[in-house]
């Protein structure tokens, strides 16, 4: 049953399934054996990254693939038979045209009542750490990826599909050049994963002044920088507890589901503590597909830190956060408390369509908001107005 909305929605978390040549079509020849390759291993098509089989996605060809939203209940914390996550996919189906074709996707968006969306990677958010030991290859891989993305999806197609080029900060000069290139092609968003940045001299905060050329461009152009969940540098810490130190999608682990490490919380803490938003007062940050529980923990720590060392902050960092950060909560989160913390103008919906953990029907997000007594005006702000605001450049 289709959920009827009194407005056309803007979804801040839509995904494509990458073409098999997304990383290779435009890859510079010097990096063909150092970045992404396809190989047949034991009769199966496998993705090699840096010469090693990569298992971030069980089937990175995405054909066949599970239907949208089949694990909705699991991610709401409901799995009464304790079925293995891999068994919840149901019958796989051939890849649908709209997962890879922008015009087919527009037709689906029309049927969904969707005005526009941020279009984000599936495989791409798991690749940065896989190449962290070869930073030139990492930078080259995402240069190639972004050119594929521009070619197949565009960065502002019909002013409705806003595909976000992926920026790795591992090489500050390359990051600034990539952003300049994307801005010339009307990019409204860029995407990266949270956590410290791997550089030739070690891990560094993304707010380190070495990355100011990138942040200055983002600030001056008035785009939105999205932090999206994915494979981060934090995965290595799980190894310290005897867990796998790399992510395999949908492989269950009790400890992984409870561990308190939080790259999104720490990333925002670092951006605030190191004064990024006061160096660049026009920055807009959106957190996507990392939920919102981290924001509550962060606010507790910000309040205490400001109470202890207020002289080290230009202002209460919670107020800085509220000006510069937009949060896309999981639909199963405490949406009422988030409204108090962030305000209705800084919450954006994200359906995660067509992923298995997302919503089968993006418009049904409305029901989750209504369950927390959001007013009609607040629902429209979260499901339309705020996303459109972020998709509009706001030059400094």
Residue ranges and their predicted role:
Residues 111-113, 124-153, 172-181, 201, ...:
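Active-site loop-helix segments enriched in His/Asp/Glu that coordinate
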Residues 10-17, 226-230:
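Histidine-centered catalytic micro-motifs
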Residues 86-97, 107-132, 160-168, 188-192:
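Divalent metal-dependent hydrolysis catalytic cores, especially in the metallo-beta-lactamase
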Residues 2-10, 19-116, 147-155, 177-180, ...:
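Mid-to-C-terminal alpha-helical segments outside catalytic/metal-binding sites
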Residues 140, 159-161, 167, 173, ...:
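Catalytic pocket-lining loop regions of alpha/beta-barrel enzymes
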Residues 87, 91, 131-135, 200, ...:
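A short, mixed-charge helix-start or loop-turn motif at secondary-structure junctions
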Residues 15, 122, 195, 231, ...:
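Flexible loop residues that form catalytic
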Residues 17-20, 25, 117-119, 125-131, ...:
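Short catalytic/ligand-binding loop motif for oxyanion handling, primarily in non-cytosolic enzymes
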């Amino acid at each position: 049953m289709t959920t009827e909305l009194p407005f056309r929605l803007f979804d801040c978390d839509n995904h494509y399934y990458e073409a098999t040549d997304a990383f290779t079509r435009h890859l510079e020849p010097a990096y063909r054996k150092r970045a992404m390759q396809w190989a047949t291993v034991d009769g199966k098509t496998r993705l090699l990254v840096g010469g090693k089989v990569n298992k971030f996605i069980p089937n990175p060809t995405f054909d066949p693939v599970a239907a949208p939203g089949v694990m909705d209940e699991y991610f709401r914390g409901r799995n009464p038979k304790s079925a293995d996550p891999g068994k919840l996919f149901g019958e796989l189906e051939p890849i649908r045209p709209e997962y890879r074709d922008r015009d087919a996707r527009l037709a689906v968006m029309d049927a969904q009542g969707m005005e526009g969306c941020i279009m984000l990677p599936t495989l791409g958010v798991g690749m940065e750490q896989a190449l962290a030991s070869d930073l030139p290859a990492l930078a080259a891989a995402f240069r190639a990826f972004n050119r594929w993305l521009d070619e197949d999806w565009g960065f502002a197609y019909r002013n409705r599909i806003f595909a976000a080029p992926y920026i790795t900060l591992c090489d500050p000069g390359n990051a600034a050049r990539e952003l300049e290139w994307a801005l010339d092609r009307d990019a409204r968003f860029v995407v990266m994963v949270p956590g410290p940045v791997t550089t030739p001299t070690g891990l560094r905060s993304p707010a380190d002044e070495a990355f100011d050329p990138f942040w200055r461009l983002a600030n001056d152009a008035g785009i939105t920088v999205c932090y999206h969940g994915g494979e981060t540098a934090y995965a290595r810490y799980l190894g310290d507890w005897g867990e796998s130190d790399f992510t395999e999608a949908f492989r269950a682990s009790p400890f992984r589901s409870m561990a308190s490490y939080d790259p999104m919380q720490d990333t925002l803490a670092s951006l605030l503590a190191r004064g990024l938003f006061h160096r660049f007062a026009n920055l807009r940050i959106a957190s996507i597909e990392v939920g919102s529980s981290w924001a509550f923990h962060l606010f507790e720590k910000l309040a205490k830190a400001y109470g202890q060392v207020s002289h080290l902050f230009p202002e209460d960092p919670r107020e800085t956060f509220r000006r510069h950060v937009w949060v896309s909560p999981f639909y199963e989160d405490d949406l009422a408390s988030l409204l108090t913390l962030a305000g209705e103008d800084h919450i954006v919906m994200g359906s995660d369509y067509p992923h298995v953990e997302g919503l089968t029907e993006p418009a049904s997000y409305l029901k989750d908001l209504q369950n927390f007594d959001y007013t009609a005006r607040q629902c429209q702000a979260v499901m339309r107005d705020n996303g459109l605001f972020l998709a509009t450049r706001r030059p400094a």
